[in-house]
From Swiss-Prot:
<feature type="binding site">
    <location>
        <position position="147"/>
    </location>
    <ligand>
        <name>GTP</name>
    </ligand>
</feature>
<keyword id="KW-0206">Cytoskeleton</keyword>
<feature type="binding site">
    <location>
        <position position="229"/>
    </location>
    <ligand>
        <name>GTP</name>
    </ligand>
</feature>
<dbReference type="InterPro" id="IPR003008">
    <property type="entry name" value="Tubulin_FtsZ_GTPase"/>
</dbReference>
<dbReference type="InterPro" id="IPR018316">
    <property type="entry name" value="Tubulin/FtsZ_2-layer-sand-dom"/>
</dbReference>
<feature type="region of interest" description="Disordered">
    <location>
        <begin position="414"/>
        <end position="452"/>
    </location>
</feature>
<dbReference type="InterPro" id="IPR037103">
    <property type="entry name" value="Tubulin/FtsZ-like_C"/>
</dbReference>
<dbReference type="InterPro" id="IPR017975">
    <property type="entry name" value="Tubulin_CS"/>
</dbReference>
<dbReference type="Pfam" id="PF00091">
    <property type="entry name" value="Tubulin"/>
</dbReference>
<feature type="binding site">
    <location>
        <position position="72"/>
    </location>
    <ligand>
        <name>Mg(2+)</name>
    </ligand>
</feature>
<comment type="function">
    <text>Tubulin is the major constituent of microtubules, a cylinder consisting of laterally associated linear protofilaments composed of alpha- and beta-tubulin heterodimers. Microtubules grow by the addition of GTP-tubulin dimers to the microtubule end, where a stabilizing cap forms. Below the cap, tubulin dimers are in GDP-bound state, owing to GTPase activity of alpha-tubulin.</text>
</comment>
<feature type="binding site">
    <location>
        <position position="11"/>
    </location>
    <ligand>
        <name>GTP</name>
    </ligand>
</feature>
<dbReference type="InterPro" id="IPR000217">
    <property type="entry name" value="Tubulin"/>
</dbReference>
<keyword id="KW-0493">Microtubule</keyword>
<feature type="binding site">
    <location>
        <position position="141"/>
    </location>
    <ligand>
        <name>GTP</name>
    </ligand>
</feature>
<keyword id="KW-0460">Magnesium</keyword>
<dbReference type="InterPro" id="IPR036525">
    <property type="entry name" value="Tubulin/FtsZ_GTPase_sf"/>
</dbReference>
């Protein structure tokens, strides 16, 4: 019931995804071979709704509802030889041999388009195995070729075939200071254009913000991608915990969307997770609802490089996990809104939703996941857009894209489409609750003029 189909694409998506499955297996007591290894006492909770993310195969093995795709075999090989490599259904690993070479056009139009049917077949097969499919979650990055180009191609195809199912993406944006590839701004801009149109909810992530959390908060001196991905997977597991474990106040992907998206195009969210503590200082932290709330709303805790203090929250959602009083949760949430009222738009009263799930993540007594729709996310788009314009003005690197059959017009279009959400976020950041009345008055005045 309420299954979620997980799709990961490209190197980044596959690495985040495989970490995520380690976390989910751990929470549900599934070992790397797919067998259930929990105790009888835990089994009620862990197995009751394990089918949100797992299929039960013959012999009691649990198989992830996951589709893995890439245009080169490298990452798949390392997943296969990794700790949880044997848990995936072998047919669900779909990969090409050529690679997309960080080129969005290859992922979207040429190489990716050749492989996409094979991926869609697997997606259909998995979707048919579901009782009542709730939606899809896609992990990908926007800077490369496969995750961005082929990832957005897949999202639009799946959208066509399952228009009424939720489409949730975990999208890793290019970082402001750290760049992996020169053509990131092109790939990201072309992708955002697709995400605005075809995704329902986008959780925006960013390596630099994750590095900062690892340095500052977790006190890791040399954080690896594994550490970053672990942070992401904690958040991913938190977003869906209410579907998988019993809770006092449940939420699901659709409730999340209904409560977070005031206008259809404004669906890019910042995410955070608490408690984040360095390995040595865990025993000194008292886990209380106020402490969690404080850390969760902290700007340093956001996993993308946009500062919520530079904008205002349109809406936000907090998912608490663990044994706690819902009354206390509600009080803390109201408290946050009252103390920082200038950071919330006034034309959406009570714009924070909270949900409570009784089962905490492994090894913690309490935890909370934060998802916020803040107008400051436009900083991310703006930054990418500036880098895009700088290169596009000189037509730098364009021949790689036109050589795959793209047209310059597409770039111009993507650029203006990138500026749409920015303008829209800005417009609603400045809007006040009584704006509407002024407009009505003006409209009425015009009306009188015409009549007279």
């Amino acid at each position: 019931m309420r299954e979620i189909l997980h799709i990961q694409g490209g190197q980044c998506g596959n690495q985040i995804g495989s970490k995520f499955w380690e976390v989910i297996c751990d929470e549900h007591g599934v070992d790397p071979t797919g067998r259930y290894k929990g105790t009888a006492a835990e089994s009620d909770l862990q197995l009751e709704r394990i089918n949100v993310y797992f299929n039960e195969a013959s012999g009691g093995r649990y198989v992830p509802r996951a589709v893995l795709m890439d245009l080169e075999p490298g990452t798949m090989d390392s997943i296969r030889s990794g700790p949880y490599g044997q848990i995936f259904r072998p047919d669900n690993l779909v990969f090409g041999q050529s690679g997309a070479g960080n080129n969005w056009a290859k992922g979207h139009y040429t190489e990716g388009a050749e492989l996409i049917d094979a991926v869609l077949d697997v997606v259909r097969k998995e979707a048919e195995n579901c009782d009542c499919l709730q939606g899809f979650q896609v992990c990908h990055s926007l800077g490369g070729g496969t995750g961005s180009g082929m990832g957005t191609l897949l999202i639009s195809k799946v959208r066509e075939e399952y228009p009424d199912r939720m489409m949730l993406t975990f999208s890793v944006f290019p970082s402001p200071k750290v760049s992996d590839t020169v053509v990131e701004p092109y790939n990201a801009t072309l992708s955002v254009h697709q995400l605005v149109e075809n995704a329902d909810e986008c959780m925006v992530l960013d390596n630099e913000a994750l590095y900062d959390i690892c340095f500052r908060t977790l006190k890791l001196t040399t954080p690896s991608f594994g550490d970053l991905n672990h942070l992401i997977s904690a958040t991913m597991s938190g977003v869906t915990c209410c579907l998988r474990f019993p809770g006092q106040l449940n939420s699901d992907l659709r409730k999340l969307a209904v409560n977070l998206i005031p206008l259809p195009r404004l669906h890019f969210f910042m995410v955070g997770f608490a408690p984040l503590t360095s390995r040595g200082s865990q025993q000194y932290i008292s886990l209380t609802v106020p402490e969690l709330t404080q850390q969760m709303w902290d700007a340093k805790n956001m996993m993308c490089a946009a500062d919520p203090r530079h904008g205002r929250y349109l809406t936000a959602s907090a998912m608490f996990r663990g044994k706690m009083s819902t009354k206390e949760v509600d009080e803390q949430m109201i408290n946050v809104q009252n103390k920082n009222s200038s950071y919330f738009v006034e034309w959406i009263p009570n714009n924070v939703k909270s949900s409570v799930c009784d089962i905490p993540p492994t090894g913690l007594k309490m935890a909370s996941t934060f998802v916020g729709n803040s107008t400051s996310i436009q900083e991310m788009f703006r930054r990418v857009s500036e880098q895009f314009t700088a290169m596009f003005r000189r037509k730098a690197f364009l021949h790689w894209y036109t050589g795959e059959g793209m047209d310059e017009m597409e770039f111009t279009e993507a650029e203006s489409n990138m500026n749409d959400p920015v303008a829209e976020y800005q417009q609603y950041q400045d809007a006040t609750a009584d704006d509407e009345e002024e407009y009505d008055d003006e409209a009425a005045d015009d009306h009188h003029q015409y009549e007279s």
